[in-house]
Amino acid sequence: MSLINYASREINCKIVYYGTGLGGKTTNLEYVYSKANPDAKGKMISLATETERTLFFDFLPIDLGEVKGFKARFDLYTVPDHVYYNTSRKLILKGVDGVIFGADSQAERMEANIEAMHNLYENLESYGYDLTNIPFPTQYNKRDLPNAMSMADLRSQLNPMGVPDFEGVAIEGQGVFETLGAGSKMVVQALS
């Protein structure tokens, strides 16, 4: 749920990077943060548990236009890697405007990808959200690895709704801004 700041004429939109452990969520966010204009981003905050961390920062892209006279500012979050921290994962989804699902392309990670997808559906349903009505691009990360599944196989198992999807090698920045750009534009369109 977007928050409106009338003083600054901004709409704060929340995008959450969700997916399997070690699938590239944090790497995506760190890459965006490292490349974003310092004047257009807030401070990155890391909330650490004993074995996990959740990252957050806000980001004001330059070229997405306005929504009814307001600039769109995006609060970008990651969720903890493991379903063990489901309470935190669920809490981070509260008030979400868009979700970027980060899938690990490695064949041996497919079961974990599917588990993370089911966990996402369950947590959204607990808030009364329907994923078919939320901007929801998918990034297939680690495309450079020799054991990466074909795009056709990934899509058949992880993208039955045919949402916009992107190939990525987040550690090199490939696909990072394409995925975020698509998700951000989808959120702005949903608000217009």
Description of each model-found segment:
Residues 2-49:
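Conserved G1/Walker A P-loop phosphate-binding module
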Residues 8, 52-55, 65-70, 91-95, ...:
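Conserved catalytic network of the ASCE P-loop NTPase/AAA+ motor domain
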Residues 17, 101, 138-140:
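Structural beta-sheet core signal
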Residues 86-108:
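Inter-motif core of Ras-like GTPase G domains
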